[in-house]
Amino acid sequence: MDNLFSTNHELIPKIEKEKLLKQKGICLWLTGLSGSGKTSIAKSVAKKLHSKGFITKVLDGDNIRLGINKNLSFSELDRMENIRRTAEISKLFVDCGIITICCLVSPKEKMRTLAKEIIGEKNFYEIFIATSL
C-alpha cells in the first residue's frame, strides 16, 4: 500500500525563506534548572535580536504545558514527549527561517539528543544556563 502522507511538506525550500528573511533558521535550546533564568534570558535575547531586525519565536516550556502539552505529567516518559513535541514545533519555525529560542529544563542528555535529532544538528545550539539559585 502506498504511503498516503507525504514527508516532504515544503513547497518553498528553507534556504529560499532564509534569503527572504535575511537570516538563518536556527534553534537556541536553553536548558538548566527550574528558576535558573532560561525564560528571562530567552526574552532578552529575542528583544535584542528583534531590535537588530531578526524574527524570533520563544517557546517556553511552562507556556507549552498550558496548551499543546497540558495532557502530560512530569513522569520521565511524559517529559520525553514534552521535549519531542516542543522540538517538532521548533523545527516548523526553523524550517521557515525563524530563530527559535526554546526554554526547557530537559535534564537528561537523551532528551536533548532527541531534540537535536528532530531539529537537525546543524540548526541546534544547546545552551546550558548555570546560575546559583
Spans of features found by a protein language model:
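Glycine-rich phosphate-binding loop of ATP-dependent small-molecule kinases
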Residues: M1-C103, P107-L133
